C-alpha cells in the first residue's frame, strides 16, 4: 500500500480533490457544479503557472524562492509599459523577457558560480523585490487598459484565454518531460548529477534552462495577476514562492530531485486553491490562507519523509527475505548432495 502511494502521488492528489469536492457538495449542494470547478481553475491559474516553472527547477534538485518577487516585478513591468502607451502584445513580451532574464541570472548564480540555490535565490528575492519598489516608488499601479483585463475574461466553456494557454502549457510540458530525451535530462540531472554528466547530459545548460523557464512562468503569472484584478499593489507576489513549492510537493515532486510529474504539480496547485475556496465557504479571514498553506506543506513533507523511509525499509526487508530464502535453499541442496551414494563413496575413499 505504501509503495502504491509513493508511486502514484498524482492519483492520491486527484483522490483528495474529488473527496474534498464530495464533502463540500454534501455541505452545500451548489458547490458541486461545473461553475465551481471553472471558478477554482480560474483562481488557480497563477499558482498553476508557478508550479510548472517550479517543477522544472525542483526536478534538477534545486529550489527557487524568488519567483514571488519575479512575479511582482513582471506585473509592474507590464503595467508600466501599458501605461506608457505600448501595446498589449509588446508589453507582455517585455514582461516575459524580464522574467526570463531574472530566471537566467538565478541559473548563472547556481551553475557557474556554484552558489547553493536556496542562498542564491534568497538574495535575488530581495533584489527583485527592491527593484520592483524602486520602479514604482512604493505606489500601486492603477488605470490599466481594458485590453489587459480581457485576457482573463471567459470566452469558451467559461474559461479565459489565459486559462486555455495554461492548459496548452501543461500538455506541452507533460509531453516534453515524459516523451523526449531533453525532458528526461531533467530527471537524470536531479537524480544523479555526476552520472548524468558521464552520460553526456549538459547538466549546466539543463539547470540554466530550468531557472529561465521558471522566470518565464513567473512573468506569465504576473501578467495573469494584473489582468485578473485590474491593478498592481506594491506587495504583488508576496508568499507565492511558498505556495508554488507546496503545490509541487503535494503533487509528488521530490525536494531531492529526479522524481515527479507536471500533472502531479498541477493537481497540487488545484488542491491548494480548492482549500482556499473552502476557507471562503467557511467565512474564515484571508490571513488563514498562509497558515493553511504552511501547515499543508509541513504535513506533506513529514508524510513524504516517513513514507519514503517506510518504503525503503520494506524494500530492504524483501531483499533480506529473498537472500535468506536463497541461503536456506543452498544449504538444503548441499545437505542432499552430501547424502547421495556417490558422495558417501567419495568420503569412504578419502578415509
UniProtKB/Swiss-Prot annotation:
Report the leader peptide range.
none
Where does this protein have coiled-coil stretches? none
What this protein is reported to do is described as: Part of the ABC transporter complex LsrABCD involved in autoinducer 2 (AI-2) import. Probably responsible for the translocation of the substrate across the membrane.
Gene Ontology cellular-component terms listed: plasma membrane
> One MF term from GO for this chain?
transmembrane transporter activity
Q: Record's family? A: Belongs to the binding-protein-dependent transport system permease family. AraH/RbsC subfamily.
Its membrane topology, per UniProt?
A: Multi-pass membrane protein
Keyword Zinc, does the record have it?
A: no
Which gene specifies this protein's sequence? lsrC
UniProt keywords, alphabetically: Cell inner membrane, Cell membrane, Membrane, Transmembrane, Transmembrane helix, Transport
Oligomeric form and interacting partners: The complex is composed of two ATP-binding proteins (LsrA), two transmembrane proteins (LsrC and LsrD) and a solute-binding protein (LsrB).
Q: Does the keyword Transferase apply?
A: no
Query: Where does this protein chiefly localize?
Result: membrane
Task: List locations, semicolon-separated.
Answer: Cell inner membrane
Give the organism the record lists. Yersinia pseudotuberculosis serotype O:1b (strain IP 31758)
Per its record, how is this protein called by name?
Answer: Autoinducer 2 import system permease protein LsrC
According to the record, the segments passing through the membrane are 14-34, 39-59, 70-90, 93-113, 115-135, 155-175, 213-233, 252-272, 284-304
Amino acid at each position: 500500500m505504501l509503495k502504491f502511494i509513493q508511486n502514484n502521488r498524482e492519483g492520491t492528489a486527484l483522490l483528495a480533490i474529488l473527496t474534498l469536492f464530495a464533502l463540500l457538495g454534501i455541505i452545500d449542494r451548489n458547490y458541486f457544479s461545473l461553475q465551481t470547478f471553472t471558478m477554482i481553475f480560474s483562481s488557480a491559474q497563477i499558482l498553476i503557472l508557478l508550479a510548472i516553472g517550479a517543477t522544472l527547477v525542483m526536478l534538477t534538485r534545486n529550489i527557487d524562492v524568488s519567483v514571488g518577487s519575479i512575479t511582482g516585478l513582471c506585473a509592474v513591468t507590464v503595467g508600466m509599459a501599458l501605461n506608457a502607451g505600448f501595446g498589449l502584445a509588446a508589453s507582455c513580451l517585455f514582461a516575459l523577457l524580464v522574467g526570463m532574464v531574472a530566471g537566467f541570472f538565478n541559473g548563472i548564480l547556481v551553475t557557474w558560480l556554484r552558489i547553493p540555490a536556496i542562498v542564491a535565490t534568497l538574495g535575488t528575492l530581495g533584489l527583485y523585490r527592491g527593484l520592483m519598489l524602486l520602479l514604482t516608488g512604493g505606489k500601486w499601479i492603477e488605470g490599466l487598459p481594458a485590453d489587459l483585463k480581457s485576457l482573463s475574461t471567459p470566452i469558451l466553456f467559461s474559461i479565459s484565454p489565459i486559462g486555455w494557454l495554461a492548459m496548452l502549457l501543461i500538455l506541452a510540458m507533460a509531453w516534453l518531460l515524459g516523451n523526449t530525451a531533453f525532458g528526461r535530462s531533467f530527471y537524470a540531472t536531479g537524480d544523479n548529477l555526476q552520472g548524468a554528466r558521464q552520460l553526456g547530459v549538459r547538466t549546466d545548460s539543463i539547470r540554466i534552462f530550468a531557472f529561465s523557464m521558471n522566470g518565464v512562468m513567473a512573468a506569465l503569472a504576473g501578467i495573469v495577476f494584473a489582468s485578473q484584478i485590474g491593478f498592481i499593489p506594491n506587495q504583488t507576489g508576496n508568499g507565492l514562492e511558498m505556495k508554488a513549492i507546496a503545490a509541487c510537493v503535494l503533487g509528488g515532486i521530490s525536494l531531492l530531485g529526479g522524481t515527479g510529474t507536471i500533472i502531479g504539480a498541477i493537481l497540487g496547485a488545484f488542491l491548494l486553491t480548492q482549500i482556499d475556496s473552502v476557507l471562503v465557504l467557511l467565512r474564515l479571514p484571508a490571513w488563514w490562507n498562509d497558515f493553511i498553506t504552511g501547515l499543508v506543506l509541513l504535513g506533506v513533507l513529514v508524510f513524504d519523509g516517513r513514507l519514503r523511509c517506510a518504503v525503503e525499509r520494506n524494500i530492504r526487508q524483501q531483499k533480506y527475505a529473498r537472500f535468506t530464502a536463497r541461503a536456506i535453499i543452498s544449504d538444503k541442496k548441499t545437505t542432499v548432495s552430501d547424502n547421495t551414494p556417490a558422495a558417501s563413496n567419495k568420503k569412504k575413499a578419502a578415509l
